[in-house]
Amino acid sequence: MTDKIAVLLGGTSAEREVSLNSGAAVLAGLREGGIDAYPVDPKEVDVTQLKSMGFQKVFIALHGRGGEDGTLQGMLELMGLPYTGSGVMASALSIDKLRSKLLWQGAGLPVAPWVALTRAEFEKGLSDKQLAEISALGLPVIVKPSREGSSVGMSKVVAENALQDALRLAFQHDEEVLIEKWLSGPEFTVAILGEEILPSIRIQPSGTFYDYEAKYLSDETQYFCPAGLEASQEANLQALVLKAWTTLGCKGWGRIDVMLDSDGQFYLLEANTSPGMTSHSLVPMAARQAGMSFSQLVVRILELAD
């Protein structure tokens, strides 16, 4: 008898709509591959009952908090249900941009200079030291919530007087916010599937940066796979991504986002342990370049579940 698979989709995070689309695509791909799969939305269904509902494995197609942050992974482990993607610790670290950066920096990997602020510090008023640290980053900067995905709450700041509004927006989404030196790009993303590093993708948004609209709504964002890098650059990028991935303890499948700055140096942006799987998504694009159909991709991700 084949395993009965729960595809978790939707959920309650800011990325619910994206997750519903990802989950629907994953479900169709698994079924096409002969897998006995069913959609389960944690917003509608008590996921603590998955085992009693007869499920033997879980494909996590949730994005953001409550699905990608280690909490769900811990629950599934306590229930003894194998699931796709990274474990508890790696999921929690990867969704947290600040702690990812601290670990990468500690491992000697390149990250953009940044200043981290808490909501309490912001509400109290920034100290002269903090203001000096922010000023030292120069302009423009990018302001982002530490634990939000899909560029939610993120904004580019080109003038000093716009910083407060950008921080206010970011603090609507998290208790910790990063102010990062702006990197000129281009942006690349590299997908990982088991032990395999898939071909890199170069991203060219039509707007200021690769924001929510560029990721999920715009048809003007351009993607290049292969990315057009020289063989030595591609090898360097893949080696960097593998180090970043293993430093966080990630496994299964996912994506690392990287920026190439004007100095010719790659800088790590963030890790995604449950990336989008929509029509605009990048892991399926990289898999296609590697000769893998969408159905083959999702079946392979499921095979890696433990």
Swiss-Prot record:
GO biological process, alphabetically ordered: cell wall organization; peptidoglycan biosynthetic process; regulation of cell shape
Gene Ontology, cellular component aspect: cytosol
Binding site for ATP: 134-189
Reaction equation(s) it catalyzes: 2 D-alanine + ATP = D-alanyl-D-alanine + ADP + phosphate + H(+)
Cellular location(s): Cytoplasm
Pathway annotation: Cell wall biogenesis; peptidoglycan biosynthesis
Domain ATP-grasp, chain residue ranges per copy: 101-303
Cofactor-binding details, from the entry: Binds 2 magnesium or manganese ions per subunit.
Binding, Mg(2+) 1: D257, E270
First-tier enzyme category under EC: ligase
Main location group: cytoplasm
SUPFAM superfamilies registered for this protein in UniProt: Glutathione synthetase ATP-binding domain-like, PreATP-grasp domain
GO MF terms, alphabetically ordered: ATP binding; D-alanine-D-alanine ligase activity; metal ion binding
Family listed: Belongs to the D-alanine--D-alanine ligase family.
HAMAP family reported in the protein's UniProt record: Dala_Dala_lig
Function statement: Cell wall formation.
Name of the protein described by the UniProt record: D-alanine--D-alanine ligase B
